[in-house]
Amino acid sequence: MEFLPDPDIDGNWWPHPAFEAEFWRDPPAVDLVHIHFGFEHRTPAQIAELCRALPVPLVLTVHDLDNPHLEDQTEHHERLQLLIDEASALITLTDQAAGILARDFGARDVRVVPHPRIVEEPVAVEPGDRAAVFLKSVRSNVVSDAQFYRDIAAQVPLDVYVHGGAELASIGTVVHEPMSDDELHAAVGRAGVCILPYTRGTHSGWLEMCRDLGVPVAVPDCGCYAGQADTPDAVEV
C-alpha cells in the first residue's frame, strides 16, 4: 500500500480531484477506488458521470446513510444509490445500517466492519460522576435549544462545553478554545457519561472515541448510533 501526500491547504478540507470524471481519462496506476466521505459537494448527475468513467472497481464504505451536515437528505440518498449500484463491494459499520441498506437501497452482500479505534493510548484521568456534552461550535446537526440542556441539568449534573463565540443563551457553559487530542481525551475521560445531542446522522467517530476512553454514551434514537455499542450497557438511547 502506498500513501500519497495530500496538498497542504492550512489543514482545511479540499475536494479531491478523483471525484471528477475527467480525472479518470488519464488514470493513475491504482487497482480500485475506495469512497468513504467527501462527495456531498457533487450533484447526483456528477456522481453518475463519475461512475461511468471509473476504469477500476469501486469499494464503498457507507458511514452516513443520512449526512449529518445536510438538512435535506434527498440528493445525498440519490448520490448514495448511484454509488451503491456501481460498487463492487460494500462496507458499513453496524448490522443495523446493513439492514437499512438492504431494505431501502437494494444493497446485497454488505460487509460490516466496526468503527476502528480512535484513541490508541488513553490519557490517564479519574472518571467523574457528571454528564458532559461537547458542542464545539454548535454545528447544524446538534440540538441548539438551551432548554434541552436545562432539562437535562435539572436531572443530572451537567457540563456543556462550547467554543468561544458559540455560547447558548441562558445556560452555563464551559467555554474553551479548540482542544488538542490529549486535552479532549482528558476532558471526555473525566465525564461519567457523554451525551451526543445529534438530530441526524448515522454513525459517530465521537461515540467510538468515548468508548475507547471507557465512557458510557447517551445517544439519540435516530441513525444507527446505538448499533455501535461494544457492550449492552455501553450505550443508552
Roles of regions detected by a PLM:
Residues 164-193:
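Nucleotide-activated donor-binding/catalytic signature segment of Leloir-type glycosyltransferases, i.e.
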Residues 13, 23-43, 57-59, 197:
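Short N-terminal targeting/anchoring amphipathic segment
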Residues 88-102, 106-122:
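Donor nucleotide-sugar binding/catalytic pocket of nucleotide-sugar-dependent glycosyltransferases
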Residues 186-202, 215:
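Acidic donor-binding loop of glycosyltransferase active sites
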Residues 196, 216-221, 226:
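Short hydrophobic beta-strand element within catalytic cores of glycosyltransferases
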Residues 48-57, 70-90:
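Membrane-proximal helix-turn-helix segments that form the acceptor-binding/catalytic region
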Residues 31-34, 50-68:
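Active-site proximal beta-strand in glycosyltransferases
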Residues 126-170:
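Conserved catalytic-core segment of nucleotide-activated headgroup transferases in glycan assembly
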